[in-house]
Amino acid sequence: SIKSLLNRSKKPDKIFINIPFKYRRFKETIKDDEIPKFDNSIVEITRCEDYGPATKLLGSLDKLEKNSLVILFDDDHVYENYMVEKFSYFYSKAPNNAYSFYVHPLRKFGIGQGADGFAINTNFLNGIKDFYNKVVKDYKELFLYDDLWISYFLYFFKKNKILSLENHLKKDKDGKFSPIYKKHIVASGLVETYGESLIEAVKKRDQIAIE
């Protein structure tokens, strides 16, 4: 995933890889000498607290510049080479919106998907760590589903629209939109968290969102 982000015409200014000192969900710990070294100044390793899947955002939150674009992505996906360029273009046109290449609809608001890239203006992240500590940290289902609570925070607390860029995906030979990532990962994490059936898992996740 990191290589796919670096191997493109428009590179990110910085890539933060956030690795907790100790995980809440696992017994294993990762020592500094076990972390791969990157021969590129763009990539920076941050050791931090375990915030669940939201570690990818909260782990380096204090290092993010104001009025800039942060893109959340999954480290087990290989992304298309136009992802950063597309996000940057739409951000430049309307920076007060958030964007994802897939937005899951849920009543009044949509849920941006980190797996499909989730682009956010850092100006709207003020207060998100307090929200995590007060609302998310001790609620297992929310702790494990960062896309949901981050989207909730942006929409209801920051009045941020979360817009889908699905119609701007490239199409395959059959004329269907191709995902923004090349490597498809089965959503087993969602199933493990909420149930054996993916449909049931999504329904339970949505029920959590509206409680």
What are these regions (language model features)?
Residues 81-105:
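Conserved donor-nucleotide/metal-binding helix-loop-beta segment in metal-dependent transferases, i.e.
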Residues 1-14, 21-22, 37:
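Short, acidic, metal-binding catalytic loop of nucleotide-sugar glycosyltransferases
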Residues 1, 127, 136-211:
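C-terminal catalytic/acceptor-binding lobe
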Residues 19, 100, 166:
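Short beta-strand/turn micro-motifs composed of small residues
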Residues 67-78:
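Short beta-strand-to-loop acidic/aromatic patch adjacent to the donor-nucleotide binding site
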Residues 1-4, 59, 85-87:
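A short acidic, amphipathic alpha-helical/loop segment
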Residues 111-132:
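Conserved nucleotide-sugar donor-binding
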Residues 16-68:
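Active-site-proximal specificity loops/subdomain of glycosyltransferases
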